[in-house]
């Protein structure tokens, strides 16, 4: 896979290396039954006229024979042959003219090595990527070829560590929105085929974000928007639909596909009763649209319970019977659903079997609108009043403490003054005694 930029070091002149590669291709073709192959002679004639670009065209086309090489041709020979071709092509000022064809050849199945063909192709494509200038748009086409091979060989783990560099590459290539979209969709397809639904959805959203407002209603944008919407609705761990509703292309479904948009709004902010009303109104539509009805029912129950927890008020608790009624389940199933909503990360709390109550520690708002702001304002007012009360108590205690300290200080001063007064009284008596003594003398 792509890594630091490097070079291929091969000794020999262009003419010598061309002759070597052409001879190797002729040998392969003759082993495949093409006895008339004379690439070596054709390229020699062109070299006499110094038509190097024409020589390279023939070599690139001839390289298709490597995909059908006999099984006895080992991986080392396969890689060495392609490295030689890449070295020759890189010497041309028109290198961009040849690399797309080479990538196309490598994207095709390598019939000579069905088990290792994907690995061989990825090795060569990685070499092309890493020997190409970091800012060259050729890298974009090479990466698309790499993605095609990874998808064909179900080798997503090879791609995963490279995804973190994708934005940096696109910036270096100064990629236009349409080309970025194509790349994001290719990554999404690879992830989807590999069962990586979260990654597939992430890159599908990134592709949708490349549509400008004026193209949000285009047929292609509509198709991708519906694909993203269906993926979000049926994904077992996706509960926040704000990422969808913020997109212009999704908002455009309000006109082109109003039923789909209505369903999205229900999952974004409504409850199970609303979803059941929707199903009654559009009987059979969910199944006809290719959606998993059971998955939608389960998700709607979890979202409904999350909404109930968020709006539980200051009591921060929900009785079992209230949960059972809202989720349209039996009382015996309540604890199972509460555990599921906790596992989904929508709510935190604990069950009180003794009181048949769910005690809520934390809840998640599905949408944050006027009602939620009012609730936040109410809670802030409550906290402010509570803190005001605490502050008043603290100030009263502080005042009492200061008063006590002042009283203690006053008492200490009084004691000190009394002691000083006593000492002064004793000192006045002593001189009189001395005077009496002096008078006797």
From Swiss-Prot:
A molecular function GO annotation: translation initiation factor activity
- KW Magnesium (keyword) present: no
The residues that cross the membrane are none
Q: Where in the cell is it found?
A: Cytoplasm
Swiss-Prot/TrEMBL keywords: Cytoplasm, Initiation factor, Protein biosynthesis
InterPro entries, from UniProt? Answer: COPS7/eIF3m (IPR045237), eIF3m (IPR027528), eIF3m_C_helix (IPR040750), PCI_dom (IPR000717)
Q: Where is the composition biased (Basic and acidic residues)?
A: 405-418
Q: How does it assemble?
A: Component of the eukaryotic translation initiation factor 3 (eIF-3) complex.
Which PANTHER family does this entry report, sorted A to Z? COP9 SIGNALOSOME COMPLEX SUBUNIT 7/DENDRITIC CELL PROTEIN GA17 (PTHR15350), EUKARYOTIC TRANSLATION INITIATION FACTOR 3 SUBUNIT M (PTHR15350:SF2)
Q: Which family does it belong to?
A: Belongs to the eIF-3 subunit M family.
> What is the protein name stated in its UniProt record?
Eukaryotic translation initiation factor 3 subunit M
The species this protein belongs to is Phaeosphaeria nodorum (strain SN15 / ATCC MYA-4574 / FGSC 10173) (Glume blotch fungus)
């Amino acid at each position: 896979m792509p890594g630091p930029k490097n070079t291929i070091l091969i000794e020999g002149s262009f003419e010598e290396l061309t002759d070597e590669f052409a001879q190797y291709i002729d040998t392969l073709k003759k082993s495949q039954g093409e006895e008339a192959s004379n690439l070596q002679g054709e390229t020699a004639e062109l070299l006499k006229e110094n038509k190097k670009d024409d020589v390279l065209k023939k070599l690139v086309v001839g390289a298709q024979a490597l995909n059908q090489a006999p099984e006895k041709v080992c991986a080392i020979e396969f890689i060495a042959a392609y490295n030689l071709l890449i070295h020759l092509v890189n010497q041309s000022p028109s290198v961009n003219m040849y690399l797309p064809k080479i990538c196309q050849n490598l994207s095709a199945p390598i019939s000579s090595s069905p088990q290792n063909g994907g690995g061989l192709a990825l090795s060569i494509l990685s070499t092309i990527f890493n020997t190409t200038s970091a800012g060259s748009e050729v890298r974009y086409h090479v990466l698309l070829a790499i993605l095609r091979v990874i998808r064909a060989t179900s080798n997503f783990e090879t791609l995963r560590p490279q995804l973190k560099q994708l934005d940096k590459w696109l910036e270096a290539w100064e990629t236009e929105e349409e080309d970025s979209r194509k790349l994001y969709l290719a990554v999404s397809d690879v992830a989807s085929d590999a069962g990586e639904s979260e990654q597939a959805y992430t890159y599908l959203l990134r592709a949708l974000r490349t549509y400008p407002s004026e193209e949000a209603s285009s047929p292609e944008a509509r198709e991708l928007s519906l694909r993203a919407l269906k993926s979000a609705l049926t994904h077992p761990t996706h509960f926040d639909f704000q990422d969808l509703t913020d997109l212009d292309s999704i908002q455009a479904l309000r006109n082109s596909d109003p039923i789909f948009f209505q369903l999205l709004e229900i999952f974004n902010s409504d409850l199970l009763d609303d979803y059941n009303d929707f199903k009654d109104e559009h009987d059979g539509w969910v199944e006809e649209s290719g959606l998993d009805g059971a998955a939608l029912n389960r998700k709607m129950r979890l979202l409904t319970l999350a909404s109930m927890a968020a709006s539980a008020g200051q009591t921060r608790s929900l009785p079992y019977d209230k949960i059972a009624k809202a989720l349209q389940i039996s009382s015996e199933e309540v604890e199972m659903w509460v555990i599921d909503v906790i596992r989904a990360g929508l709510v935190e709390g604990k069950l009180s079997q003794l009181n048949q109550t769910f005690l809520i520690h934390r809840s998640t708002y599905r949408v944050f609108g006027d009602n939620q702001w009012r609730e936040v304002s109410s809670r802030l007012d409550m906290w402010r009043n509570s803190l005001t009360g605490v502050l008043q108590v603290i100030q009263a205690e502080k005042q009492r403490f200061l008063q006590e300290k002042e009283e203690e200080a006053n008492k200490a001063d009084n004691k000190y003054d009394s002691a000083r007064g006593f000492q002064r009284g004793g000192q006045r008596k002593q001189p009189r005694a001395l005077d009496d003594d002096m008078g006797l003398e």
